[in-house]
Amino acid sequence: MHLVDRVGANAPHKKYERVTTQPENPFFNIVHNQSVAIIPSFTLESGVILYDCPVAYKTFGVLNESADNVMVICHALTGSADVEDWWGPLIGPGRAFDTSRYFIVCCNSMGSPYGSASPCTLDSTTGRRYGPEFPLTTVRDDVRYGSTITMKLGCLLTYYRIHKLIMDDLGVRQIAVVIGGSMGGMLALEWAYFGKDYVKAVVALATSARHSAWCISWGEAQRQSIYSDPKYDDGYYSFSDPPYTGLGAARMSALLTYRSRNSFESRFGRNIPDPSRHPYINTSQPPSHPAEEHYDIHNEGFRNRKGFRRSSTTTSDAPPSPTRTSSTSSTDAITPASTTPLHPSRAQPSGIATPPNSVSDPFRPVKRPCPTYFSAQSYLRYQADKFVKRFDANCYIAITRKLDTHDVSRGRTSTLHEALAMIEQPTLIIGIESDGLFTFAEQMELAEYIPDARLKRIDSPEGHDAFLIMFAEVNRYICEFLREVQPEIMGKEGVHVESKVGEIRASTTGEVEDITHW
Protein backbone atom coordinates (compact mmCIF):
# COMPACT_ATOMS: atom_id res chain seq x y z
CA MET A 1 0.00 0.00 0.00
CA HIS A 2 1.32 3.44 -0.85
CA LEU A 3 -0.62 6.57 -0.04
CA VAL A 4 -0.08 9.99 -1.56
CA ASP A 5 2.69 11.84 0.25
CA ARG A 6 2.39 15.53 -0.58
CA VAL A 7 1.45 18.92 0.78
CA GLY A 8 -0.66 21.73 -0.58
CA ALA A 9 0.56 24.29 -3.05
CA ASN A 10 0.88 26.86 -0.26
CA ALA A 11 3.61 24.89 1.52
CA PRO A 12 6.86 26.86 1.91
CA HIS A 13 10.21 25.77 0.55
CA LYS A 14 11.63 23.29 3.00
CA LYS A 15 14.30 24.73 5.27
CA TYR A 16 16.05 21.49 6.15
CA GLU A 17 18.02 19.20 3.88
CA ARG A 18 16.37 15.87 3.06
CA VAL A 19 18.21 12.57 2.59
CA THR A 20 16.99 9.19 1.45
CA THR A 21 19.80 6.96 2.72
CA GLN A 22 21.55 6.27 6.01
CA PRO A 23 24.39 3.89 5.12
CA GLU A 24 25.72 3.64 8.67
CA ASN A 25 22.40 2.29 9.96
CA PRO A 26 21.50 -1.30 8.93
CA PHE A 27 17.91 -0.84 10.16
CA PHE A 28 17.12 2.24 8.09
CA ASN A 29 15.90 0.42 4.98
CA ILE A 30 13.42 -1.66 6.96
CA VAL A 31 11.02 1.28 6.65
CA HIS A 32 10.11 2.03 3.04
CA ASN A 33 9.60 5.44 1.42
CA GLN A 34 10.25 7.57 4.48
CA SER A 35 11.74 11.05 4.43
CA VAL A 36 14.62 12.17 6.64
CA ALA A 37 15.19 15.82 7.51
CA ILE A 38 18.62 16.87 8.76
CA ILE A 39 18.48 19.45 11.56
CA PRO A 40 21.84 21.32 11.58
CA SER A 41 21.90 21.54 15.37
CA PHE A 42 19.43 20.62 18.04
CA THR A 43 19.63 21.22 21.79
CA LEU A 44 18.24 18.48 23.98
CA GLU A 45 16.44 19.12 27.24
CA SER A 46 19.71 18.16 28.99
CA GLY A 47 21.58 20.93 27.17
CA VAL A 48 23.51 18.50 24.96
CA ILE A 49 23.67 19.62 21.32
CA LEU A 50 23.21 17.15 18.48
CA TYR A 51 24.68 18.25 15.15
CA ASP A 52 23.33 17.16 11.75
CA CYS A 53 20.50 15.46 13.58
CA PRO A 54 18.29 13.21 11.41
CA VAL A 55 14.52 13.01 11.89
CA ALA A 56 12.67 10.32 9.94
CA TYR A 57 9.00 10.80 9.11
CA LYS A 58 6.23 9.78 6.74
CA THR A 59 3.21 11.73 5.55
CA PHE A 60 -0.10 10.60 4.05
CA GLY A 61 -2.86 12.62 2.43
CA VAL A 62 -2.89 16.30 1.47
CA LEU A 63 -2.26 19.45 3.51
CA ASN A 64 -5.13 21.85 2.85
CA GLU A 65 -4.78 25.50 1.87
CA SER A 66 -5.17 26.72 5.44
CA ALA A 67 -2.60 24.14 6.64
CA ASP A 68 -4.78 23.12 9.58
CA ASN A 69 -6.08 19.65 8.71
CA VAL A 70 -3.09 17.91 10.26
CA MET A 71 -3.30 14.64 12.17
CA VAL A 72 -0.12 13.72 14.06
CA ILE A 73 0.25 10.03 14.93
CA CYS A 74 2.86 8.94 17.48
CA HIS A 75 4.30 5.42 17.43
CA ALA A 76 4.87 3.03 20.33
CA LEU A 77 8.15 1.69 21.74
CA THR A 78 9.38 -0.47 18.87
CA GLY A 79 7.34 1.16 16.09
CA SER A 80 8.45 3.37 13.23
CA ALA A 81 7.13 6.31 11.22
CA ASP A 82 5.24 3.89 8.97
CA VAL A 83 1.70 3.97 10.41
CA GLU A 84 0.55 1.46 7.79
CA ASP A 85 2.93 -1.07 9.29
CA TRP A 86 1.34 -1.20 12.74
CA TRP A 87 -2.07 0.51 12.45
CA GLY A 88 -2.82 -0.23 8.80
CA PRO A 89 -6.52 -1.13 9.17
CA LEU A 90 -7.21 2.33 10.62
CA ILE A 91 -5.72 4.36 7.76
CA GLY A 92 -7.55 5.41 4.62
CA PRO A 93 -10.66 7.32 3.44
CA GLY A 94 -13.62 6.86 5.76
CA ARG A 95 -11.52 5.42 8.56
CA ALA A 96 -10.14 6.91 11.77
CA PHE A 97 -6.99 8.07 9.99
CA ASP A 98 -8.89 9.51 7.05
CA THR A 99 -6.41 10.41 4.32
CA SER A 100 -9.12 12.14 2.29
CA ARG A 101 -9.70 14.68 5.07
CA TYR A 102 -6.48 14.83 7.09
CA PHE A 103 -2.83 15.38 6.30
CA ILE A 104 -1.24 12.68 8.45
CA VAL A 105 2.30 12.99 9.80
CA CYS A 106 4.18 10.41 11.85
CA CYS A 107 7.70 11.16 13.07
CA ASN A 108 10.15 8.56 14.32
CA SER A 109 11.21 9.15 17.93
CA MET A 110 14.86 9.73 18.79
CA GLY A 111 16.52 6.60 20.11
CA SER A 112 14.66 4.34 17.66
CA PRO A 113 16.76 2.50 15.05
CA TYR A 114 14.42 3.46 12.20
CA GLY A 115 15.98 6.68 10.98
CA SER A 116 15.94 9.43 13.62
CA ALA A 117 19.01 10.22 15.72
CA SER A 118 19.92 7.14 17.75
CA PRO A 119 22.82 4.91 18.77
CA CYS A 120 22.74 3.60 15.16
CA THR A 121 23.35 7.00 13.52
CA LEU A 122 26.55 8.97 13.04
CA ASP A 123 27.89 11.51 15.47
CA SER A 124 29.02 14.11 12.94
CA THR A 125 31.63 15.45 15.38
CA THR A 126 33.49 12.12 15.44
CA GLY A 127 32.45 10.43 12.20
CA ARG A 128 31.49 7.31 14.15
CA ARG A 129 28.21 5.82 15.24
CA TYR A 130 27.03 7.03 18.63
CA GLY A 131 26.59 3.54 20.03
CA PRO A 132 26.39 3.65 23.85
CA GLU A 133 27.51 7.30 23.82
CA PHE A 134 24.19 8.48 22.43
CA PRO A 135 22.81 10.98 24.98
CA LEU A 136 19.60 10.48 26.92
CA THR A 137 16.59 11.87 25.07
CA THR A 138 13.23 12.54 26.71
CA VAL A 139 9.66 12.43 25.52
CA ARG A 140 9.74 16.23 25.59
CA ASP A 141 12.81 16.31 23.35
CA ASP A 142 10.67 14.64 20.69
CA VAL A 143 7.61 16.82 21.07
CA ARG A 144 7.35 20.25 22.55
CA TYR A 145 9.18 23.48 23.22
CA GLY A 146 10.31 24.57 26.66
CA SER A 147 9.57 27.82 28.39
CA THR A 148 11.07 31.00 27.04
CA ILE A 149 14.25 31.57 29.02
CA THR A 150 15.92 34.86 29.90
CA MET A 151 19.59 34.58 28.96
CA LYS A 152 22.55 36.30 30.62
CA LEU A 153 22.67 38.98 27.94
CA GLY A 154 18.99 39.78 28.40
CA CYS A 155 17.76 38.17 25.19
CA LEU A 156 15.01 35.57 25.05
CA LEU A 157 15.47 32.07 23.73
CA THR A 158 12.88 29.38 23.13
CA TYR A 159 13.96 25.76 22.82
CA TYR A 160 11.84 24.03 20.17
CA ARG A 161 11.40 20.29 20.23
CA ILE A 162 12.34 18.29 17.23
CA HIS A 163 9.00 17.06 15.87
CA LYS A 164 7.66 20.61 16.07
CA LEU A 165 10.52 21.68 13.80
CA ILE A 166 9.36 19.13 11.22
CA MET A 167 5.80 20.45 11.40
CA ASP A 168 7.05 23.97 10.79
CA ASP A 169 9.17 22.79 7.87
CA LEU A 170 6.15 21.08 6.30
CA GLY A 171 4.19 24.33 6.49
CA VAL A 172 1.82 23.19 9.25
CA ARG A 173 0.01 26.10 10.93
CA GLN A 174 -2.28 24.15 13.23
CA ILE A 175 -2.65 20.51 14.29
CA ALA A 176 -6.22 19.22 14.25
CA VAL A 177 -5.55 16.14 16.39
CA VAL A 178 -2.68 14.17 17.89
CA ILE A 179 -3.14 10.41 18.37
CA GLY A 180 -0.87 7.90 20.08
CA GLY A 181 -0.89 4.70 22.08
CA SER A 182 1.44 3.45 24.82
CA MET A 183 4.66 5.47 24.39
CA GLY A 184 2.87 7.30 21.59
CA GLY A 185 0.20 8.29 24.10
CA MET A 186 2.89 9.93 26.22
CA LEU A 187 3.91 12.02 23.22
CA ALA A 188 0.27 12.85 22.50
CA LEU A 189 -0.19 14.20 26.04
CA GLU A 190 2.96 16.32 25.70
CA TRP A 191 1.66 17.75 22.41
CA ALA A 192 -1.37 19.01 24.36
CA TYR A 193 0.80 21.48 26.26
CA PHE A 194 1.27 23.55 23.12
CA GLY A 195 -2.24 24.77 23.91
CA LYS A 196 -5.57 24.57 22.14
CA ASP A 197 -4.72 27.29 19.64
CA TYR A 198 -2.08 25.04 18.06
CA VAL A 199 -3.28 21.50 18.92
CA LYS A 200 -7.07 21.24 18.68
CA ALA A 201 -7.71 17.72 20.05
CA VAL A 202 -5.91 14.75 21.59
CA VAL A 203 -6.46 10.97 21.55
CA ALA A 204 -4.38 8.90 23.98
CA LEU A 205 -4.65 5.12 24.16
CA ALA A 206 -3.30 2.72 26.82
CA THR A 207 -0.86 5.22 28.30
CA SER A 208 -0.24 7.17 31.51
CA ALA A 209 0.38 10.63 32.86
CA ARG A 210 3.72 9.44 34.21
CA HIS A 211 5.68 6.23 33.91
CA SER A 212 4.85 4.02 36.88
CA ALA A 213 7.21 2.14 39.19
CA TRP A 214 5.83 -1.07 37.67
CA CYS A 215 6.74 -0.01 34.13
CA ILE A 216 10.12 1.36 35.21
CA SER A 217 10.89 -1.98 36.83
CA TRP A 218 9.99 -3.97 33.72
CA GLY A 219 12.22 -1.70 31.64
CA GLU A 220 15.07 -2.24 34.08
CA ALA A 221 14.66 -6.03 33.93
CA GLN A 222 14.75 -5.88 30.13
CA ARG A 223 17.89 -3.72 30.08
CA GLN A 224 19.60 -6.06 32.52
CA SER A 225 18.88 -8.92 30.12
CA ILE A 226 20.85 -7.06 27.46
CA TYR A 227 23.65 -6.08 29.84
CA SER A 228 24.09 -9.71 30.91
CA ASP A 229 24.92 -10.86 27.38
CA PRO A 230 28.76 -11.01 27.12
CA LYS A 231 28.49 -9.78 23.54
CA TYR A 232 26.96 -6.51 24.75
CA ASP A 233 30.48 -5.28 25.62
CA ASP A 234 29.29 -2.04 27.29
CA GLY A 235 27.44 -1.22 24.07
CA TYR A 236 30.57 -1.23 21.88
CA TYR A 237 29.54 -4.33 19.94
CA SER A 238 29.64 -4.60 16.17
CA PHE A 239 26.53 -5.04 14.06
CA SER A 240 28.08 -8.26 12.74
CA ASP A 241 28.08 -9.82 16.22
CA PRO A 242 25.46 -8.09 18.40
CA PRO A 243 24.04 -9.27 21.75
CA TYR A 244 21.19 -11.23 20.22
CA THR A 245 20.67 -13.43 23.26
CA GLY A 246 20.25 -10.53 25.66
CA LEU A 247 18.02 -8.54 23.31
CA GLY A 248 15.91 -11.62 22.64
CA ALA A 249 15.45 -12.20 26.37
CA ALA A 250 14.43 -8.55 26.78
CA ARG A 251 11.84 -8.97 24.04
CA MET A 252 10.43 -12.10 25.68
CA SER A 253 10.06 -10.23 28.94
CA ALA A 254 8.32 -7.35 27.18
CA LEU A 255 5.91 -9.66 25.36
CA LEU A 256 4.68 -11.01 28.68
CA THR A 257 3.71 -7.48 29.71
CA TYR A 258 1.93 -6.77 26.42
CA ARG A 259 -0.57 -9.59 26.90
CA SER A 260 -2.48 -10.90 29.89
CA ARG A 261 -2.27 -14.17 31.78
CA ASN A 262 -5.68 -15.19 30.47
CA SER A 263 -4.72 -14.48 26.86
CA PHE A 264 -1.63 -16.70 27.14
CA GLU A 265 -3.63 -19.42 28.86
CA SER A 266 -6.39 -19.43 26.25
CA ARG A 267 -3.92 -19.35 23.36
CA PHE A 268 -1.39 -21.91 24.59
CA GLY A 269 -2.45 -23.66 27.77
CA ARG A 270 -0.09 -26.60 28.24
CA ASN A 271 0.04 -27.39 24.53
CA ILE A 272 3.26 -28.72 23.10
CA PRO A 273 4.72 -28.19 19.61
CA ASP A 274 4.28 -30.92 17.02
CA PRO A 275 6.63 -33.72 18.18
CA SER A 276 7.28 -34.77 14.58
CA ARG A 277 8.96 -31.41 14.00
CA HIS A 278 11.04 -31.57 17.19
CA PRO A 279 12.11 -35.22 17.67
CA TYR A 280 15.12 -34.32 19.77
CA ILE A 281 15.56 -31.29 21.99
CA ASN A 282 18.01 -28.75 20.57
CA THR A 283 19.83 -31.43 18.56
CA SER A 284 19.73 -33.16 15.22
CA GLN A 285 20.69 -36.53 16.70
CA PRO A 286 19.61 -38.55 19.72
CA PRO A 287 21.70 -38.48 22.90
CA SER A 288 24.31 -41.23 23.26
CA HIS A 289 24.46 -41.32 27.04
CA PRO A 290 22.01 -40.81 29.92
CA ALA A 291 23.95 -37.79 31.16
CA GLU A 292 23.75 -36.29 27.69
CA GLU A 293 19.98 -36.64 27.69
CA HIS A 294 19.82 -34.91 31.08
CA TYR A 295 22.12 -32.20 29.73
CA ASP A 296 19.85 -31.68 26.72
CA ILE A 297 16.77 -31.23 28.89
CA HIS A 298 18.59 -28.94 31.31
CA ASN A 299 19.97 -26.64 28.59
CA GLU A 300 17.02 -26.79 26.20
CA GLY A 301 16.46 -23.26 24.89
CA PHE A 302 19.97 -21.99 25.71
CA ARG A 303 21.16 -20.66 22.37
CA ASN A 304 24.84 -20.22 23.21
CA ARG A 305 25.55 -23.60 24.71
CA LYS A 306 28.87 -25.23 23.78
CA GLY A 307 27.83 -28.85 23.77
CA PHE A 308 27.71 -31.83 26.11
CA ARG A 309 30.95 -32.53 27.99
CA ARG A 310 31.76 -35.88 29.57
CA SER A 311 32.90 -35.63 33.17
CA SER A 312 36.66 -35.25 33.60
CA THR A 313 38.87 -38.01 35.02
CA THR A 314 40.72 -35.43 37.10
CA THR A 315 39.71 -33.11 39.89
CA SER A 316 41.00 -30.13 37.93
CA ASP A 317 38.70 -27.17 37.39
CA ALA A 318 39.61 -27.17 33.70
CA PRO A 319 36.54 -27.79 31.51
CA PRO A 320 36.38 -31.30 30.06
CA SER A 321 36.18 -31.87 26.33
CA PRO A 322 32.76 -31.93 24.68
CA THR A 323 31.55 -35.11 23.04
CA ARG A 324 29.50 -33.41 20.33
CA THR A 325 28.38 -30.02 19.15
CA SER A 326 24.72 -29.14 19.45
CA SER A 327 22.88 -27.98 16.36
CA THR A 328 22.35 -24.59 17.98
CA SER A 329 25.91 -24.12 19.18
CA SER A 330 27.64 -20.97 18.01
CA THR A 331 31.10 -22.55 18.43
CA ASP A 332 33.22 -24.36 15.88
CA ALA A 333 33.19 -28.15 15.64
CA ILE A 334 34.83 -29.78 18.63
CA THR A 335 36.84 -32.99 18.61
CA PRO A 336 35.19 -36.08 20.06
CA ALA A 337 35.73 -36.79 23.70
CA SER A 338 37.84 -39.60 25.09
CA THR A 339 36.23 -42.99 25.54
CA THR A 340 37.24 -42.97 29.20
CA PRO A 341 34.37 -44.26 31.39
CA LEU A 342 32.24 -41.61 33.07
CA HIS A 343 33.54 -42.27 36.59
CA PRO A 344 36.55 -44.62 36.30
CA SER A 345 37.40 -44.24 39.97
CA ARG A 346 34.12 -45.95 40.74
CA ALA A 347 34.89 -49.29 39.08
CA GLN A 348 31.97 -51.64 38.71
CA PRO A 349 32.17 -54.71 40.96
CA SER A 350 32.09 -58.08 39.26
CA GLY A 351 28.58 -59.24 38.52
CA ILE A 352 27.28 -55.71 37.91
CA ALA A 353 25.77 -55.07 34.48
CA THR A 354 27.71 -53.07 31.93
CA PRO A 355 26.66 -49.38 31.85
CA PRO A 356 24.13 -48.63 29.10
CA ASN A 357 26.63 -46.55 27.12
CA SER A 358 28.84 -49.50 26.35
CA VAL A 359 29.34 -50.65 22.79
CA SER A 360 27.52 -53.90 23.47
CA ASP A 361 24.43 -52.17 24.83
CA PRO A 362 23.93 -48.77 23.15
CA PHE A 363 21.96 -46.17 25.11
CA ARG A 364 18.29 -45.82 24.27
CA PRO A 365 16.59 -42.61 25.40
CA VAL A 366 13.92 -43.38 27.95
CA LYS A 367 10.37 -42.20 27.51
CA ARG A 368 10.02 -38.93 29.36
CA PRO A 369 7.34 -38.91 32.04
CA CYS A 370 6.18 -35.38 31.15
CA PRO A 371 6.63 -32.72 28.43
CA THR A 372 9.62 -30.42 28.74
CA TYR A 373 8.94 -28.08 25.81
CA PHE A 374 5.69 -26.13 25.49
CA SER A 375 4.04 -24.04 22.78
CA ALA A 376 4.23 -20.92 24.95
CA GLN A 377 8.00 -21.26 25.04
CA SER A 378 8.11 -21.84 21.30
CA TYR A 379 6.12 -18.65 20.70
CA LEU A 380 8.42 -16.53 22.85
CA ARG A 381 11.55 -17.89 21.17
CA TYR A 382 10.13 -17.39 17.70
CA GLN A 383 9.16 -13.79 18.41
CA ALA A 384 12.54 -13.08 20.01
CA ASP A 385 14.33 -14.47 16.94
CA LYS A 386 12.29 -12.19 14.68
CA PHE A 387 12.79 -9.14 16.85
CA VAL A 388 16.59 -9.27 17.10
CA LYS A 389 16.80 -9.10 13.31
CA ARG A 390 14.90 -5.81 13.17
CA PHE A 391 15.96 -3.92 16.31
CA ASP A 392 19.16 -2.78 17.98
CA ALA A 393 20.14 -3.45 21.60
CA ASN A 394 21.56 0.03 22.27
CA CYS A 395 18.40 1.56 20.82
CA TYR A 396 16.28 -0.64 23.06
CA ILE A 397 18.18 0.67 26.07
CA ALA A 398 17.94 4.28 24.88
CA ILE A 399 14.23 4.26 24.17
CA THR A 400 13.24 2.44 27.38
CA ARG A 401 15.18 5.07 29.31
CA LYS A 402 13.20 7.69 27.39
CA LEU A 403 10.01 6.14 28.78
CA ASP A 404 11.37 6.48 32.31
CA THR A 405 11.57 10.28 31.89
CA HIS A 406 7.83 10.62 31.27
CA ASP A 407 5.94 12.70 33.84
CA VAL A 408 3.68 15.50 32.62
CA SER A 409 4.02 17.31 35.96
CA ARG A 410 7.83 17.43 35.88
CA GLY A 411 8.89 21.07 35.92
CA ARG A 412 5.30 22.26 35.39
CA THR A 413 3.29 21.85 38.56
CA SER A 414 3.65 20.53 42.08
CA THR A 415 1.12 17.73 41.50
CA LEU A 416 0.20 15.44 38.65
CA HIS A 417 -3.46 16.40 38.78
CA GLU A 418 -2.63 20.08 38.43
CA ALA A 419 -0.63 19.28 35.31
CA LEU A 420 -3.50 17.30 33.79
CA ALA A 421 -5.89 20.16 34.56
CA MET A 422 -3.77 22.37 32.27
CA ILE A 423 -4.81 20.34 29.21
CA GLU A 424 -7.57 22.38 27.56
CA GLN A 425 -8.33 20.40 24.41
CA PRO A 426 -11.15 17.92 23.91
CA THR A 427 -9.44 14.64 24.76
CA LEU A 428 -10.35 11.02 24.14
CA ILE A 429 -8.83 8.43 26.47
CA ILE A 430 -9.07 4.77 25.43
CA GLY A 431 -8.12 2.05 27.91
CA ILE A 432 -8.07 -1.74 28.03
CA GLU A 433 -9.67 -3.48 30.98
CA SER A 434 -7.08 -6.30 31.00
CA ASP A 435 -4.01 -4.07 30.51
CA GLY A 436 -1.51 -4.92 33.23
CA LEU A 437 1.15 -2.50 32.00
CA PHE A 438 -0.81 0.76 31.67
CA THR A 439 -3.76 -0.09 33.87
CA PHE A 440 -7.32 0.98 33.28
CA ALA A 441 -7.12 2.88 36.58
CA GLU A 442 -4.45 5.08 34.98
CA GLN A 443 -6.79 5.80 32.06
CA MET A 444 -9.54 6.71 34.52
CA GLU A 445 -7.15 9.12 36.23
CA LEU A 446 -6.40 10.85 32.92
CA ALA A 447 -10.10 11.14 32.09
CA GLU A 448 -10.99 12.42 35.54
CA TYR A 449 -8.47 15.24 35.73
CA ILE A 450 -8.28 16.41 32.10
CA PRO A 451 -11.22 18.86 32.07
CA ASP A 452 -12.71 18.06 28.64
CA ALA A 453 -11.93 14.33 28.50
CA ARG A 454 -14.09 11.35 27.73
CA LEU A 455 -13.17 7.73 28.49
CA LYS A 456 -13.78 4.65 26.36
CA ARG A 457 -13.16 1.08 27.47
CA ILE A 458 -12.02 -1.86 25.35
CA ASP A 459 -13.23 -5.12 26.89
CA SER A 460 -10.60 -7.52 25.64
CA PRO A 461 -8.59 -10.26 27.36
CA GLU A 462 -5.57 -9.47 25.19
CA GLY A 463 -3.96 -7.00 27.60
CA HIS A 464 -1.94 -3.95 26.57
CA ASP A 465 -1.64 -4.97 22.91
CA ALA A 466 -5.41 -4.73 22.47
CA PHE A 467 -4.98 -1.11 21.35
CA LEU A 468 -3.15 -2.51 18.29
CA ILE A 469 -5.46 -5.51 17.85
CA MET A 470 -9.03 -4.36 18.43
CA PHE A 471 -9.17 -2.34 15.22
CA ALA A 472 -12.96 -2.11 14.97
CA GLU A 473 -13.42 -0.65 18.45
CA VAL A 474 -10.50 1.76 18.16
CA ASN A 475 -11.67 2.90 14.73
CA ARG A 476 -15.24 3.47 15.96
CA TYR A 477 -14.23 5.39 19.08
CA ILE A 478 -11.86 7.70 17.20
CA CYS A 479 -14.32 8.36 14.35
CA GLU A 480 -17.12 9.19 16.80
CA PHE A 481 -14.83 11.55 18.70
CA LEU A 482 -13.63 13.36 15.58
CA ARG A 483 -17.17 13.77 14.25
CA GLU A 484 -18.12 15.30 17.61
CA VAL A 485 -15.23 17.74 18.05
CA GLN A 486 -14.22 18.47 14.42
CA PRO A 487 -17.37 18.71 12.31
CA GLU A 488 -15.67 21.36 10.17
CA ILE A 489 -13.31 18.64 8.90
CA MET A 490 -15.36 15.47 9.21
CA GLY A 491 -18.50 17.10 7.78
CA LYS A 492 -16.85 18.03 4.50
CA GLU A 493 -16.47 15.75 1.53
CA GLY A 494 -12.97 14.35 1.42
CA VAL A 495 -10.54 14.93 -1.42
CA HIS A 496 -9.63 12.13 -3.79
CA VAL A 497 -6.55 10.24 -2.66
CA GLU A 498 -4.88 7.70 -4.90
CA SER A 499 -4.18 4.69 -2.74
CA LYS A 500 -4.74 1.02 -2.19
CA VAL A 501 -6.28 1.55 1.20
CA GLY A 502 -7.45 -1.56 3.00
CA GLU A 503 -5.01 -3.76 1.14
CA ILE A 504 -3.47 -6.37 3.40
CA ARG A 505 0.30 -6.34 3.14
CA ALA A 506 3.16 -7.91 5.01
CA SER A 507 4.57 -5.85 7.84
CA THR A 508 8.05 -4.57 7.02
CA THR A 509 9.18 -4.58 10.65
CA GLY A 510 7.15 -7.61 11.67
CA GLU A 511 5.17 -5.51 14.14
CA VAL A 512 1.76 -6.46 12.80
CA GLU A 513 2.51 -10.18 12.65
CA ASP A 514 4.05 -10.11 16.12
CA ILE A 515 0.85 -8.67 17.53
CA THR A 516 -2.00 -10.16 15.51
CA HIS A 517 -0.74 -13.53 14.26
CA TRP A 518 -0.19 -15.38 17.47
Swiss-Prot record:
It is an enzyme of class 2 (transferase). It comes from Ascobolus immersus. Transmembrane segments: none annotated. Commits homoserine to the methionine biosynthesis pathway by catalyzing its O-acetylation. Pathway: Amino-acid biosynthesis; L-methionine biosynthesis via de novo pathway; O-acetyl-L-homoserine from L-homoserine: step 1/1. This is Homoserine O-acetyltransferase. Pfam families: Abhydrolase_1. The keyword Ubl conjugation does not apply. Residues 69-468 form the AB hydrolase-1 domain. The active site is at residues 182, 435, 464. It comes from the Eukaryota. One of its GO terms (molecular function) is homoserine O-acetyltransferase activity. Residues 290-303 have a biased composition (Basic and acidic residues). Residues 267-365 are annotated as: Disordered. It catalyses: L-homoserine + acetyl-CoA = O-acetyl-L-homoserine + CoA. Residues 310-341 have a biased composition (Low complexity).
